[in-house]
């Protein structure tokens, strides 16, 4: 056996495994409460019947605080120490999640969702202008808290997916990503029904990814993570 140099603290981990913390590139924090359930529907129906109604509850600050507390607690107790996380479309709830992650000592990119179409009235922003104004408020708050480009928990521009964000909204999000110099995340090519839907919504595009790239949200100057593709 080797002897440690004088003054070096020795920690004995005999019988244990030391491993780097894992990185999860795609998490939906508000979906944690029903993880492993509601598996009876295909994606697009599943969103409408289960996901959007649950995420709409995060408009309530108390609900968001408690829901995210369970998520952050269990994430901290897992092997995942860094993640790219989707929150909801609610600015204040997204900030609550970011604060809880920071206080727990975790590292993450977190996204306030952009959604102004193809979801229930109870879970949709009024229009692109309103959504962009809230996104800017969120980014300005991050800047004021010195988390825009520094610290373990930072913002990430997040149109939920192309069917959820109008062309005007996507264009504005691309401009905000460039203006604030922050990365982006979304979904891409999750299943055949979604791919067909995007093709119908974006007839001028040749492939799904182009619905993002034409607005500067597909790599290049804006680092981008696309889930499920």
Question: Which residues are covered by each model-predicted region?
Answer:
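Conserved acidic residues
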Residues: 7-8, 81, 224
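Histidine-rich, glycine-flanked metal-binding segment
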Residues: 1-19
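Histidine-centered catalytic micro-motifs
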Residues: 20-32, 183-192
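Short N-terminal targeting/anchoring amphipathic segment
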Residues: 12, 24, 84-86
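Metal-coordinating catalytic core of metallo-dependent amide/deamination hydrolases
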Residues: 92-229
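Short, function-defining helix-loop hinge/capping sites that tune catalysis or transport
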Residues: 29-36, 168, 195
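Short hydrophobic "helix-edge" motifs at membrane interfaces and signal-peptide entry regions
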Residues: 15-17, 69, 177
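Alpha-helical scaffold segments that flank or form the walls of functional sites
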Residues: 35-106, 131-149
């Amino acid at each position: 056996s080797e002897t440690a140099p004088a003054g070096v603290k020795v920690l004995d981990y005999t019988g244990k495994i030391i491993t780097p913390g894992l990185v999860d590139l795609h998490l939906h924090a508000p979906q944690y409460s029903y993880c492993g359930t509601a598996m009876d529907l295909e994606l697009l129906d599943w969103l409408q019947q289960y996901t959007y109604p649950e995420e709409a509850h995060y408009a309530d600050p108390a609900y968001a605080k408690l829901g995210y507390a369970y998520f952050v607690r269990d994430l901290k107790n897992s092997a995942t120490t860094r993640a790219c996380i989707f929150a909801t479309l609610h600015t204040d709830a997204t900030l609550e999640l970011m604060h809880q992650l920071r206080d727990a000592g975790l590292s993450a990119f977190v996204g306030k969702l952009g959604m102004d179409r193809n979801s229930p009235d109870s879970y949709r922003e009024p229009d692109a202008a309103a959504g962009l104004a809230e996104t800017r408020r969120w980014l300005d708050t991050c800047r004021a808290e010195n988390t825009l480009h520094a610290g373990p928990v930072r913002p990430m521009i997040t149109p939920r997916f192309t069917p959820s964000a109008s062309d005007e909204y996507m264009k504005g999000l691309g401009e905000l990503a460039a203006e604030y110099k922050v990365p982006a995340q979304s979904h891409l090519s999750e299943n055949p029904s979604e791919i067909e839907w995007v093709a119908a919504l974006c007839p001028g595009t040749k492939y799904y990814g182009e619905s993002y790239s034409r607005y500067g949200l597909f790599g290049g100057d804006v680092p981008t993570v696309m889930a499920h593709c």
